[in-house]
Amino acid sequence: CSESESKGGNVMDWKLKFISQENFVKHVEATIDKYGEKLESFDIKRFNKNIIDPIKLIFDKTVYQSTWEEMVGNEIFRQRDKSNNNDIGYFHQTIFQYMKNCHVPENGKEGGWDVIYENADGIQLPEGDVVHKIYVEMKNKHNTMNSASTGKTYMKMQNQLLNDDDCACFLVEAIAQKSQNITWNPTV
């Protein structure tokens, strides 16, 4: 957005109904602010904070015919990119706070759910059941769940459903291979 747009100027019609243009700009700015520390330069201590596979590094250097400087630069980029993916997850998750009846719990609170949606009038599920609360587990992409996290997520949902018969649990992929609304049947 240009500065005039962020200050309330209306260069284009704002189409999103659940969030004002001003709040959207603030949300984007908060996400960009999270990138901040990752842009600081790397020293050897910071570089070694993550465990690096030296064997893979040697293979990659040889196969890609790269210099050590290029390999270190690539590793720094990889580490930053991994952290930035978490920040994009923050963007996906916390934008729900602007949607009516949605609540984004603090990290690790309220059962560790990413989003909780409540509607006193009830929410009709595709099978016809009506519940008043939906617990959401969000994943950035379809490939972010390995078998361990699939099992953990399934057990978390199963536990919630056993303790609250007036709810449903949804697994939401922010960036899915294709848009779908299906029952999740994990293989654990």
Give the role of each language-model region.
Residues 108-113, 147-149:
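Basic, glycine-/proline-tolerant helical and adjacent loop/strand elements
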Residues 1-91:
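Interdomain/boundary linker segments immediately adjacent to catalytic/signaling cores
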Residues 140-188:
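Catalytic cores of nucleic-acid endonucleases
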Residues 7-11, 117, 185-188:
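Short, intrinsically disordered, charge-balanced linker/junction segments flanking boundaries
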Residues 83-108:
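Short N-terminal edge-element motif at the start of the domain
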Residues 100, 114-145:
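Conserved catalytic cores of phosphodiester-cleaving nucleases, focusing on short active-site segments
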Residues 106-107, 126-127, 159-163:
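Short, conserved, surface-exposed binding loops centered on an aromatic residue
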Residues 33-47, 132-154:
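Generic detector of solvent-exposed, compositionally biased contiguous segments
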